[in-house]
Amino acid sequence: MSMATEVRYDCATDGFILHTPHRHAAKFMPYIALEGQPKSSVVMARLWVGEQDCGIHPFLVPCRDARGALCQGVSVSSPDVLDLPYFDVVDHAIITFEQVTLPRWAWLRGHEHDISAGGVFHSRLASQRDIFFSSLRRVEWGKLVLTASLIPGLKLSLALAIHYAQQRPLHAHNGRVIPLAHHALHRRILTRAYVTGLAAMALYEGIKQRHLPDGRHSSRFQTDAGLVKAVAVELMRTSLQHCMQRCGAQGKFLRNRIAPTLQLCDLVGTAEGDSMPVLMKVAKDILAWPDESQDDDTPLGQLLLRMRRQMNQQLADATDKLAAWHDLGCEAARLGWLAGNLEALRHLGSRDDIRTACREQLMLDYAPQLLHHGLCSPAEIAALPARQEATLDHVWEHHAARVPDEFDVRDLMAATPLGSPDLASAWFALAPSLHDPQPEG
């Protein structure tokens, strides 16, 4: 709400003038540093109509013209200033605006706001806070679009990591040669990555299908888009990290595609709003939901209700509501994370074994809270690790070998060394200058 970039309505042209008033109002923006392509950006700025502060609104701003040159009044830092390790993916830059003229249509006002012919601002919304969140809703679909960009790479990464575990030979002390997947810890970590990735994709797909018919007009759209951004993206990040770690050095090579996907995940996690404040906003919305919308008659569903009631009571009892909300930040994050994961479970469809594995992991994560609220006994919590290991072994046995076909990525796997049936031969084919010894055996 401290947005300093300003845009002023110009009665003479019925347009706007966008301006960066001081250094602290400069923006970090993606897709803008490199020349050669036309580029536009959605810029959030404080709208002034005369002397009236009309709140934060989105504006569509042409930044580079058809030749890729900067538009008049737009200045950006050179590509080497923001030295991101993945510069080739998103060309971030620092950007400022100096009296940039915008046409009337650049104002993404929706149906809630207008400026009359006499230069008077009108809004159906009651406060600047409502205006701000209405403005955010105008670009909320971006959270889903960005999340969707991760799914192909996530599927390929899971298929590659599982394939590597099945193909990588280990020489045991007794002379036997066994695959890496023979080690229970390794395959269970990968299976957990697999079910976590499926949960993330189910959350994204379920919420997308819920809102496609009505666009952004549902009262829950902003909260649901936040769940995708704050929960689905972070679940994908966890899954990708396991994939890269379980492939060792092989997982870090760019040509094996896992590392670039993890880098992209990092970018998505901070685009369209950083995941943590988005999760906090989701938690605040959840506090107002009716009980019946979350009551699924399970220990985790009951836990969500109890955490919510407890937080509402603490906020109601507080003299300083804002200070109380800040003090409850960790609890709010746990509430939002639990709500997002429960939503993912609902969208996993008929895959009962996948849902069971996800639920057992979630119960382990929330074991202290389940015990505190008396929703599980100590004996039930103590039995969870062994139960989950058995569930993960079942999922590995019945699904792991079919992951490349389930995700339809065999052609993509074939383009990577990790996806080759003979890893050593794949690398030697890429390095003809190497002395090639006789194949093993």
Predicted segment positions?
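Flavin-dependent oxidoreductase catalytic core characteristic
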Residues: 1-441
